[in-house]
């Protein structure tokens, strides 16, 4: 849930006035898995990928977060927590950062900020539940199709005469659904043959999704 634009949301303006604003280039790392959690982040502009790595360094993308989303909120509720995932800039980002200690002080003054954060956490829990269900009940073709539909709803998806256009590599799709890049390529070709999508390099048009 996007909190709103700074010029039209007094609560957001007030919150951001207590934060430090930092800019991150695309593909830079905002949060390292395993580091001590002491800071809450809020995406002012841009989007990020939340991911985990196994012992061999293989990555799995858990989610994408966009403008108006909080990051790193779990450590807010229990001291001594370590970051459970990596967060990497998907695009160039402008991010507001505030210590947990200062955030706790702010919500004493304006509890609405905490309500907004809680609403986001509830929505993410619902998305996670749906993803677990997809892993359990959908085959890899279904998971890829569902992923494309979800990506077509992201803020950085672009309108296209035939649907919605997204930019994503086969490797990234594989990291989301848990399969190889080669498998993704075969399934995208199959979806193309069924006239459900068109795929050219990183550009995919998902038909009929506007």
UniProtKB/Swiss-Prot annotation:
Disulfide bonds: none annotated. 3',5'-cyclic AMP 2 binds at residues 136-137, 171-181. It comes from Salmonella typhimurium (strain LT2 / SGSC1412 / ATCC 700720). SUPFAM superfamilies: cAMP-binding domain-like, Winged helix' DNA-binding domain. The gene is crp. This is cAMP-activated global transcriptional regulator CRP. Residues 180-186 bind DNA. The N-terminal domain binds cAMP and is responsible for homodimerization, while the C-terminal domain binds DNA when cAMP is bound. Keywords: Acetylation, Activator, cAMP, cAMP-binding, DNA-binding, Nucleotide-binding, Transcription, Transcription regulation.
């Amino acid at each position: 849930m996007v909190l709103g634009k700074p010029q039209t949301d007094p609560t957001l303006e007030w919150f951001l006035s207590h934060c430090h604003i930092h800019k991150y280039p695309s593909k830079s790392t905002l949060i390292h898995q395993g580091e001590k959690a002491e800071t809450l982040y809020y995406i002012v502009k841009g989007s990020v990928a939340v991911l985990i790595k196994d012992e061999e360094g293989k990555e799995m993308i858990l989610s994408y977060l966009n403008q108006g989303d909080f990051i790193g909120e779990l450590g807010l509720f229990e001291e001594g927590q370590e970051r459970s995932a990596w967060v990497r800039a998907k695009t160039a980002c402008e991010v507001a950062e505030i210590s947990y200690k200062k955030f706790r002080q702010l919500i004493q003054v304006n509890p609405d900020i905490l309500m907004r954060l809680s609403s986001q956490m509830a929505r993410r829990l619902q998305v996670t539940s749906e993803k677990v269900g997809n892993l359990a009940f959908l085959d890899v073709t279904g998971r890829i199709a569902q992923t494309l539909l979800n990506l077509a709803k992201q803020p950085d998806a672009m309108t296209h005469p035939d649907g919605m256009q997204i930019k994503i590599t086969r490797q990234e799709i594989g990291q989301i659904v848990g399969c190889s890049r080669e498998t993704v390529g075969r399934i995208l070709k199959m979806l193309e043959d069924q006239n459900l999508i068109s795929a050219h390099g990183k550009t995919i048009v998902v038909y009929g999704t506007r």
